């Protein structure tokens, strides 16, 4: 009789584990500690002078399975990260001198998330001086990150989401560390 009582609980847990969980922008943005490290190295030409164009690529998460990264979530993470290091202006006016264009090219995930989940991402970044139209920076940044089984025991989709967010946070961190080396 006790076993019969466990069946509805097990069914509920399996249904909840099957729901799609989209990646969120804030966990993809760089941490305050990373922002503090980078902020001191930002060239004067980039301080409050980098805007973000509409991000291309990305995919909405399905209702029942998986975890994807939408273009809007990546754009919000980029804007938050640029703001944290002092590159993004506080208001849209006056218009910033530079425009960062980003395209999510690749999101490699396992078909069936197992014990540990490793996700690979590739994002193409282009920084354009809007006054001259000159490309100041262009690079495809690819990296991987993972989420362990212990971080989301019940939900494989939650592990995918965690790995997505970590991989993109590391990707944005690499971008910002590249940008502070430029002298436009």
Region spans (language model):
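Short alpha-helical interface patches
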Residues: 71-83, 95
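Short, intrinsically disordered/low-complexity patches at protein termini
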Residues: 46-49, 123-125, 159-162
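Sec-dependent bacterial lipoprotein signal peptides
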Residues: 1-19
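A structural "domain/chain start" motif
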Residues: 19-76, 179-184
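Surface-exposed short loop/turn segments
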Residues: 20-29, 85, 89-138, 145-158
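Short secondary-structure boundary motifs at beta->alpha junctions and helix caps
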Residues: 60-69, 131-177
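Sec-exported extracytoplasmic/periplasmic mature domains
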Residues: 79-87, 109, 172-184
């Amino acid at each position: 009789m006790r076993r019969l009582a466990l069946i509805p609980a097990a069914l509920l847990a399996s249904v909840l584990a099957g729901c799609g969980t989209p990646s969120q922008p804030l966990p993809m943005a760089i941490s305050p500690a990373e922002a503090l490290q980078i902020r001191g190295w930002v060239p004067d030409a980039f301080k409050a002078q980098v805007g973000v164009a509409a991000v291309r690529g990305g995919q909405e998460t399905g209702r029942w399975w998986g975890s994807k990264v939408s273009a809007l979530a990546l754009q919000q993470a980029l804007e938050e990260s640029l703001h944290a290091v002092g590159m993004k202006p506080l208001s849209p006016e006056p218009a910033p001198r530079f425009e960062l264009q980003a395209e999510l090219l690749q999101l490699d995930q396992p078909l069936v998330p197992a014990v540990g989940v490793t996700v690979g991402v590739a994002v193409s970044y282009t920084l354009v001086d809007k006054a001259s139209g000159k490309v100041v920076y262009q690079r495809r940044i690819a990296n991987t990150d993972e989420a362990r089984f212990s971080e989301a025991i019940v939900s494989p989709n939650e592990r995918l989401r965690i790995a997505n967010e970590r991989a993109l946070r590391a990707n944005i961190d690499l971008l910002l560390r590249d940008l502070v080396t430029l002298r436009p």
